[in-house]
């Protein structure tokens, strides 16, 4: 089986909510010498992007999202130890405060991005899901003067709108200049990031790690 065929199978396993088969495919891919990062970026993340697009278009609903998320979680149990082995040593890239927006409990992409940031040298403080903007601002204030990156996720357009409110609150509390702000999720676009005055977004978790490192330079 070629690498491309493996990646296609991984993609389809996520889209088809194959909870048991996805981690087994990951083991097969690792045994073939495919790096964990490639398994995520070229296979699993492609599947999650399709799932996110289908959800946004109301082609699938929460039960399907949850099952695809379970398949992804099972895959990450196999892959995270491999990512840890290759974790970059040296100075911490900074503190990444990660969270899912208020009103949103979809944490699949959030968990994946958090894992990838940790594997790339960030210290992680994970606030979890359905997080109030007030809570994010409070945490940012506690770490004023440090290298801080706020990483917010929203799968739904309604919860994405709260990102603008967060940016406004950071400005009001005079914290905006002391943190970098990065947002992701199916409805988030470059245009939206520019509109609300944030620093960056990314297409997938692996790209998020690269963009985050660039933003924090």
From Swiss-Prot:
GO biological process: homocysteine metabolic process; methanogenesis; tetrahydrofolate metabolic process
Family matches, as CDD domains: corrinoid_protein_B12-BD
Location of the B12-binding domain: 93-217
MF terms (GO), sorted A to Z: cobalamin binding; cobalt ion binding; methionine synthase activity
Pathway: One-carbon metabolism; methanogenesis from methylamine
Family: Belongs to the methylamine corrinoid protein family.
Stated role: Acts as a methyl group carrier between MtmB and MtbA.
Subunit structure: Can form a complex with MtmB.
Full protein name: Monomethylamine corrinoid protein 2
Organism the protein comes from: Methanosarcina barkeri
Organism placement in taxonomy: Archaea, Methanobacteriati, Methanobacteriota, Stenosarchaea group, Methanomicrobia
């Amino acid at each position: 089986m070629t690498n491309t065929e493996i990646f296609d199978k991984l993609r389809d396993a996520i889209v088809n909510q194959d909870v048991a088969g996805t981690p087994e495919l990951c083991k097969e891919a690792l045994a073939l010498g495919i790096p964990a990062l490639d398994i995520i970026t070229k296979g699993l993340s492609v599947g999650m992007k399709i799932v996110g697009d289908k959800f946004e278009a109301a082609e699938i609903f929460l039960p399907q999202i949850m099952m695809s998320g379970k398949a992804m979680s099972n895959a990450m149990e196999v892959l995270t130890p491999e990512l840890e082995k290759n974790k970059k040593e040296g100075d911490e890239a900074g503190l990444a405060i990660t969270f899912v927006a208020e009103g949103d409990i979809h944490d699949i992409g959030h968990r994946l991005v958090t894992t990838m940031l940790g594997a790339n040298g960030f210290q992680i403080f994970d606030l979890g899901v359905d997080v109030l903007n007030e809570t994010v601002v409070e945490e940012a204030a506690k770490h004023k003067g440090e290298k801080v990156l706020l990483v917010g996720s929203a799968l739904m357009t309604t919860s994405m709108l709260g990102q603008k409110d967060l940016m406004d609150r950071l400005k009001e509390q005079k914290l905006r200049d002391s943190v970098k702000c990065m947002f992701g999720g199916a409805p988030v676009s470059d245009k939206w990031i520019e509109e609300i005055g944030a620093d960056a977004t990314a297409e997938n978790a692996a790209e998020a790690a690269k963009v985050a490192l660039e933003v924090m330079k």
